[in-house]
A protein has these predicted regions:
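A beta-strand edge to alpha-helix "cap/lid" segment located at domain peripheries
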Residues: 2-10, 23, 28-29, 44-128
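Core segments of small alpha/beta cavity-forming domains
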Residues: 10-40
C-alpha cells in the first residue's frame, strides 16, 4: 500500500470504528483493540476546547462512551494528504451528528508511516 493510501485508510477506518463505538455496534473488546492499535503509544491530541489528551487518557476515555450515542454519525469531508519520509499529514473536516445536534471541526493529523500502516501520532482539532 502506498503512503497516501495508508494515511487515508487509517483516517477512514478510525472514523468508521469510532462511529461504531459511539453507537455500540460490534463486539466491544475487539473494536477497542482495533481502535487503539491504530495509534502510536506517543499519540497526543489537542481538542477543539484546547485540552491536551495523551494516548493513555484517550484509551481510558473510550470505555466511558461505548454505546452512549446510538444515533451518532461521523462524516469526513475535504480530506487532503501530504507525506514525506516516515510521516503523513492529513487535513480534513469532521462532522458529528447526534439526533438534532451537529458539531464540526477542522483537523490536522500527523501519522507515523510503517511498512504495514499509518499510526496516529498527533491530532489538532479546531471547532468550526
Amino acid at each position: 500500500m502506498k503512503d497516501k493510501e495508508k494515511v487515508i485508510t487509517a483516517l477512514v477506518s478510525f472514523c468508521n470504528n469510532i462511529e461504531k463505538w459511539f453507537t455500540g455496534e460490534g463486539e466491544q473488546d475487539m473494536l477497542y483493540q482495533e481502535i487503539v492499535s491504530g495509534f502510536s503509544p506517543d499519540f497526543k491530541m489537542i481538542t477543539g476546547d484546547g485540552d491536551a489528551v495523551s494516548f493513555y487518557m484517550f484509551s481510558e476515555w473510550l470505555p466511558t462512551v461505548y454505546g452512549k450515542f446510538p444515533s451518532r454519525l461521523v462524516i469526513l469531508e475535504d480530506i487532503e494528504v501530504q507525506y514525506s519520509g516516515k510521516h503523513g499529514l492529513a487535513t480534513y473536516t469532521e462532522i458529528q451528528t447526534t439526533e438534532e445536534e451537529t458539531t464540526c471541526r477542522a483537523s490536522s493529523a500527523i501519522f507515523l508511516l510503517t511498512e504495514e500502516k499509518a499510526l496516529w501520532f498527533h491530532l489538532i482539532e479546531s471547532w468550526i
